[in-house]
């Protein structure tokens, strides 16, 4: 057998073996073993994201200047919006390219790949221009108080300069998966995150650069991710190309690609607007309130992020058994994932509440600000155990292929419900109401999501029994 043919045969046999092994895991292994096998890698990936999101604020907090902590919190939402656009483009590009390859439409795949590359760079350049030319206007909209303007402007301008790198790395880490190249996207983002975490203490503490150092570390992390993805595209990809001629062949595909990725980014867009509105309300009470709320949020985010990671990991398990109409196993999966996520939520929430002063102290050094953060933290964790049901319901709807209800659920908690809750609760209860709005929004989102989940499950039972 020729060597090339032998390699192809071996690769096919390996893929077939992996597929059979995965099917056995989905179908035959104990539910607990299947859940943990699938959830652990997902949770580890989520934890890296949590550490990445905490790093800047943690090391800035070590300076003992809570104003700089608040500055980071104020600027965050506008870059979340930019990331949401990148997520839409990346997820849409991955789906459209993969579908085109499956249909043997390689020219379409190349056009979409080139559009994703150049659109991410172009969007990043436009974002950079807007952020640099309208810094004060944007910061005013974001809720920056007078004492935050200097730090926030510096932080935003440095990050803005690296926006093309950020958007490119987010978009292409998703798009390369369309060719089956899972590792390059994951490893590039991981390398960028590790670079950021290593450089943060060097620039922030060692060189005493504060928020400027934090921003530079972030940009350099994105640069590392971009370089690794660029090397892969140029050396290993058979479809993706930096040649603009492919993008110019069918530019109309860009709108279709963005539309396909809309469900993946819309929740992040709404979350960014909700965070901006929250900071606008918090600014009424000064930068100390913004810093306190940011510290409370960072201290508790690990709870919901791990719950989300568990449910994301279990999603293919639910999808396989939903497709097989294995109702007893579906029921067992739902029950055990609920037990795991809610049980973890209860334990972690209790731990966070008992250790709230120490957690807040990681980010805030001023005693008065830390006390505000501890008080606000209660409202952010009180409903967190229930969010296990929320993420389980959302992932079950996705696994069932109900894109509409899955999208509705994804925009509820941090967007469609939270924004009106912030307005109403602040009107009645002031600063405390801003934090309590998250509790009300979470509970309402859980009730709606679980209702949709039960409806979908009963539909499966009903349609299966009639066959």
Enumerate the predicted regions with their spans:
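Short alpha-helical transmembrane segments in multi-pass integral membrane proteins
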Residues: 1-39, 97-164, 206-262, 318-383, ...
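Short runs within selected transmembrane alpha-helices of multi-pass transporters and secretion channels
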Residues: 159-177, 185-193, 214-229, 308-311, ...
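Small-residue-rich hydrophobic transmembrane alpha-helices
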Residues: 69-129, 166-185, 279, 292-350, ...
């Amino acid at each position: 057998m020729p060597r090339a043919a032998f390699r192809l045969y071996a690769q096919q046999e390996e893929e077939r073996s992996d597929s059979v092994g995965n099917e056995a895991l989905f179908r035959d292994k104990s539910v607990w073993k299947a859940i943990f096998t699938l959830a652990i890698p997902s949770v580890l990936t989520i934890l890296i994201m949590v550490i990445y999101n905490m790093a800047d604020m943690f090391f800035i907090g070590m300076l003992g200047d809570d104003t700089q902590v608040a500055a980071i919190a104020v600027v965050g939402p506008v870059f979340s919006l930019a990331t949401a656009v990148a997520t839409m483009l990346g997820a849409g590009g991955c789906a459209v390219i993969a579908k085109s390859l499956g249909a043997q439409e390689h020219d379409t795949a190349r056009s979409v790949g080139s559009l994703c590359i150049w659109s991410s760079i172009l969007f990043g350049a436009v974002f950079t221009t807007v952020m640099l030319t309208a810094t004060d206007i944007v910061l005013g909209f974001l809720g920056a108080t007078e004492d935050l303007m200097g730090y926030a402007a510096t932080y935003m301008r440095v990050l803005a300069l690296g926006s093309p790198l950020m958007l490119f790395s987010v978009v292409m880490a998703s798009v390369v998966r369309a060719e089956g190249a899972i590792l390059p996207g994951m490893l590039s983002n991981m390398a960028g995150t590790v670079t950021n975490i290593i450089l943060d203490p060097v620039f922030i503490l060692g060189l005493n650069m504060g928020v400027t150092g934090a921003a530079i570390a972030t940009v350099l992390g994105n640069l590392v991710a971009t370089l690794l993805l660029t090397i892969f595209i140029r050396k290993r990809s058979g479809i993706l190309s930096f040649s603009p001629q492919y993008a110019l062949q069918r530019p109309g595909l860009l709108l279709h690609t963005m539309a396909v990725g809309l469900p993946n980014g819309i929740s992040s867009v709404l979350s960014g607007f909700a965070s901006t509105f929250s900071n606008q309300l918090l600014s009424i009470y000064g930068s100390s309130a913004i810093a306190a709320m940011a510290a409370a949020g960072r201290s508790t985010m690990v709870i919901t992020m791990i719950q989300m990671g568990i449910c994301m990991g279990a999603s293919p398990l639910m999808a396989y058994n939903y497709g097989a109409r294995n109702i007893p196993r579906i029921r067992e999966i739902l029950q055990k994932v609920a037990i795991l996520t809610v049980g973890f939520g209860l334990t972690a929430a209790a731990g966070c509440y008992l250790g709230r002063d120490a957690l807040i102290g990681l980010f805030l050094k001023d005693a008065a600000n830390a006390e505000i953060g501890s008080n606000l933290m209660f409202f952010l964790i009180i409903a967190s155990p229930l969010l296990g049901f929320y993420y389980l319901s959302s992932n079950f709807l996705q696994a069932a292929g109900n894109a509409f209800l899955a999208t509705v659920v994804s925009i509820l908690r941090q967007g469609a419900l939270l924004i009106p809750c912030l307005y109403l609760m602040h009107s009645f209860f002031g600063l405390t109401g801003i934090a309590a709005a998250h509790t009300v929004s979470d509970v309402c989102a859980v009730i709606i999501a679980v209702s949709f989940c039960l409806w979908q499950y009963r539909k499966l039972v009903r349609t299966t029994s009639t066959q």
